[in-house]
Amino acid sequence: IHGDINLIVEDFPYNQFDYCILTQTIQAVQKPDVLLNTLKKVSKNIIVGFNNSGRLSKSLQFLLSGSFDSLLKKSDSDQWYNTDYIHPCSIKDFKKLSTDLNFKIVSTFDVINMAQFTNGKMPSNLFCKEVLFHLKNER
């Protein structure tokens, strides 16, 4: 399926898919909260993957450089104004958004270390670079 993710999702009927998967997408869409709410009607299960902007190494980069470029860029040619990251967020930020939108967080997974984690068992917000969330629509 190909199209503008900000628009195309609205055209699908209720419960069209078993799973919807967003990888490296949620931070680049115009309105992540609206997209997630729209996906609720399309699927009861949503997998969301993103880079954790709240990890310790990113915080230290910003502290030492004083520049958002160090937080947002993927390569040396990227600057804060031309990166595809519109909404950098941390694991903690995404957990709050998920709760605010009435999603149940079924599981979270540290992609780099290939480890599942739960609240309090791993300092995920500080050390996890890439994360996957399995969300379930509670409605």
Give a label for each model feature.
Residues 1-10:
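Conserved SAM-binding strand-loop segment of SAM-dependent methyltransferases
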Residues 7, 27, 55:
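Active-site micro-motifs of SAM-dependent methyltransferase domains
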Residues 10-19:
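A short acidic, Gly/Pro-enriched loop at the edge of an enzyme's catalytic core
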Residues 18-31:
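A short SAM/SAH-binding and catalytic strip from SAM-dependent methyltransferases
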Residues 30-41, 45-138:
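S-adenosyl-L-methionine-dependent methyltransferase catalytic module, highlighting the catalytic core
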